[in-house]
């Protein structure tokens, strides 16, 4: 997207504290921006080599977090945390740079990739005690800022019910703190009179389980609504109606096409998104019939306006392949102990849909070591009518609804030119 806009003469600025963008596997897409600003120290950012000795860290439930402990000691007050620094930098860019581009008649994109409210759910007071004032550090220990990743937290004994309440409270604290600092950006939009000629989009990539179904974090289970259903806010002067709500199926893929339309730029022909402008101006009530979601090697999900279908792979989860244009950029280093196999002599060069050159294709068979993100505590086929059953309690597998969504999933995969292996793996051939 940024490369397309930059070629069209749009100034693009990235402001972020998202550490994964700058790791091996991040693909260096930040270099496509006109300029980028990285605020250091979130989660596992390799920023500092030693911690403040007065900071002992917090319980990690078996996962080491030395990198964050090293960074955390350098946050002297709330404004030093990565989230507040990111929002401050974004507001400063709006104040100090955006007016120059407006006066010069140069369109601009400010992309604020804020990692919060991601774990660690670490905040200073008064946020830390705001939603659980009864937590006594002298008795209960430090605030719990690292949630476990499990499909059975309390049930398995990974955490107690009391610890679960504390984790939810710390998530709320992190959410409230970053919401407060996001207000600084919105205040600057007010101060610069930007609302009349600026499209503002607020979205996120995924949710976080906080005890729903006793799931915590982002474990290897199907994508239920708390993780999959994300918020989206758009203000488009002269197009959207302030304060209105649109009941339509959208996906983050659509934001690419939406931004291209906002800037008057043609989207690449192979892009899968659809502009959301017709929903905003009222000229349409729907822009897509389906949306896809999933995690490599696990279930593939398809949704229409009212239903969701998670189809698990059949039998031995084969054929399964991983495709990469540069295996050396795969995130091997992120969690080397959590299984990321190198390619072997079965790897071949093959073409992915839309690729102009062959890429590495590594097949996997039952018994192979799989990447850590493909780990599944359980895989199952699920079908829900979200309009009638928003809590996803009644599995409609075996009903006519499943047959209809089988057909829809097959149609969607064919429409995006998914490899034939994907349909075979899911038993859709």
Segment roles from a protein language model:
Residues 13-14, 20-26, 44-47, 116-123, ...:
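Short catalytic/ligand-binding loop motif for oxyanion handling, primarily in non-cytosolic enzymes
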Residues 81-102, 138, 152-198, 262, ...:
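A long, amphipathic alpha-helix that forms part
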Residues 120-133, 188-247, 251:
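Histidine-centered active-site microenvironments of extracellular/periplasmic hydrolases
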Residues 165-177, 219-230, 240-257, 263-274:
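A short beta-strand-to-alpha-helix junction
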Residues 224-225, 295-397:
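C-terminal, low-complexity/hydrophilic appendages and adjacent surface loops
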Residues 23-37, 71, 76-138, 190-199, ...:
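Active-site regions of oxyanion-processing enzymes, predominantly non-cytosolic
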Residues 21, 83, 87, 196-198, ...:
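Polar, surface-exposed loop/tail segments
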Residues 1-76, 295:
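Catalytic-site neighborhoods of secreted/periplasmic enzymes
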């Amino acid at each position: 997207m940024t490369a397309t806009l930059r070629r069209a003469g749009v100034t693009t600025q990235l402001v972020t504290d998202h550490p994964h963008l700058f790791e091996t596997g991040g693909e260096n897409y930040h270099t496509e921006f006109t300029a980028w600003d990285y605020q250091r120290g979130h989660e596992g950012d390799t920023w500092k080599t030693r911690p403040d000795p007065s900071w002992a860290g917090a319980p990690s439930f078996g996962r080491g977090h030395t990198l964050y402990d090293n960074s955390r000691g350098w946050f002297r007050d709330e404004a030093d945390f990565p989230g507040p620094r990111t929002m401050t930098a974004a507001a400063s860019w709006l104040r100090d740079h955006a007016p120059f581009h407006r006066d010069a008649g140069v369109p601009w994109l400010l992309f604020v990739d804020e990692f919060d409210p991601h774990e660690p759910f670490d905040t200073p007071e008064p946020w830390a005690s705001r939603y659980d004032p009864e937590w006594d550090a002298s008795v209960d220990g430090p605030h719990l800022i690292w949630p476990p990743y499990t499909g059975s937290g309390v049930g398995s004994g990974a955490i107690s019910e009391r610890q679960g309440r504390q984790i939810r409270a710390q998530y709320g604290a992190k959410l409230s703190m970053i919401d407060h600092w996001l207000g600084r950006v919105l205040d600057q939009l007010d101060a610069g009179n930007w609302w009349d000629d600026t499209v503002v989009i607020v979205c996120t990539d995924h949710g976080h389980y906080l005890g729903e179904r006793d799931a915590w974090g982002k474990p290897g289970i199907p994508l239920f609504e708390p993780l999959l259903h994300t918020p989206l806010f758009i203000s488009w002067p002269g197009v959207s109606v302030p304060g209105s709500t649109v009941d339509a199926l959208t996906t983050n893929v659509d934001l690419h096409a939406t931004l291209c339309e906002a800037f008057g730029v043609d989207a690449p022909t192979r892009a899968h998104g659809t502009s959301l402008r017709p929903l905003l101006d009222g000229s349409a009530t729907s822009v897509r019939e389906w949306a896809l979601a999933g995690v490599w090697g696990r279930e593939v999900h398809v949704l229409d306006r009212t239903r969701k279908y998670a189809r698990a792979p059949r039998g031995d989860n084969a054929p399964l392949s991983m495709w990469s244009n540069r295996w050396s950029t795969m995130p091997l280093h992120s969690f080397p102990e959590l299984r990321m196999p190198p390619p072997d002599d079965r790897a071949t060069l093959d073409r992915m849909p839309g690729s102009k050159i062959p890429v590495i294709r590594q097949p996997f068979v039952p018994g192979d070591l799989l990447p850590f993100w493909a780990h599944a505590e359980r895989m199952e086929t699920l079908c829900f009518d979200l309009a009638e059953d928003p809590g996803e309690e009644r599995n409609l597998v075996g009903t006519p609804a499943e047959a209809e969504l089988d057909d829809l999933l097959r149609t969607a995969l064919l429409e995006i030119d998914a490899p034939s292996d994907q349909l075979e793996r899911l038993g859709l051939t």
